[in-house]
Amino acid sequence: MNALTAVHNNAVDSGQDYSGFTLIPSAQSPRLLELTFTEQTTKQFLEQVAEWPVQALEYKSFLRFRVGKILDDLCANQLQPLLLKTLLNRAEGALLINAVGIDDVAQADEMVKLATAVAHLIGRSNFDAMSGQYYARFVVKNVDNSDSYLRQPHRVMELHNDGTYVEEITDYVLMMKIDEQNMQGGNSLLLHLDDWEHLDHYFRHPLARRPMRFAAPPSKNVSKDVFHPVFDVDQQGRPVMRYIDQFVQPKDFEEGVWLSELSGAIETSKGILSVPVPVGKFLLINNLFWLHGRDRFTPHPDLRRELMRQRGYFAYATHHYQTHQ
């Protein structure tokens, strides 16, 4: 199995009942599914993982898989195959996940445990140099002086893939809402590559496969530049991307103009989804054929949003990019 193996027989269409959770198509797109853990599942999970504080998950990486197994067992071992099937399915590849009863910032540690369990049923989350852990928590406020658009509230954070400036493969991205106060706007933005009307034009351009330099600002704590093309293909020849407009460094006029046009074509796509993510919920997407970003917020002096992210590789994948390793 590879990271983009075609998977048929859509689980939502089959009418199958699941133990411990429900699964429905989202209001925004049939590609994005909503998975909700029942109140009983949530309660039992939190009780069974209560002996391990988040610090234990940070220090002992095998515990991240242990809590994943606990969650899967509570779901009659139906959860892990469903997660993998959805994320590896090119026609879907995205989930909005919620646990009934987890919806307040006071439960932040419980949120980290739940997200960790889910992520480690599909693979392993990479070391995040920005935080020094396998996950990162960060806050968006009304005023920001950071060196990237990650925390800037009053502008759109453009659509991009994660992991463009590191050497580790980034198959999945998990983005969780921990807290939100005095907030209007700021929906998550998603674009599936196959819904991008300009994909064929840019994928077939001569510069699409040229290795380009990606360099991160100081806040990312990554000092080494990496080189890779914007586009690649999976084993079936379908396009995948590793792109972010902030960190790609064109070497000449030709690359700069092409990248600028590429950015404009992505940001004006009619296929972009706007997805509200309430506190306690998280998005889990296939990073190779979904781009993600964030809409702007309405200014407020006490605006606050806290997020948690994890990004990593599918443990069940053997090949990620067909031509560029």
From Swiss-Prot:
Keywords assigned: Dioxygenase, Iron, Metal-binding, Oxidoreductase
Reactions catalysed according to its record: glutarate + 2-oxoglutarate + O2 = (S)-2-hydroxyglutarate + succinate + CO2
One Pfam family per UniProt: CsiD
Binding site for Fe cation: H160, D162, H292
Domain of life the protein comes from: Bacteria
UniProt pathway: Amino-acid degradation
HAMAP family given in the database record: glutarate_hydroxylase (MF_01083)
Assembly description: Homotetramer.
Protein name: Glutarate 2-hydroxylase
Protein encoded by which gene: glaH
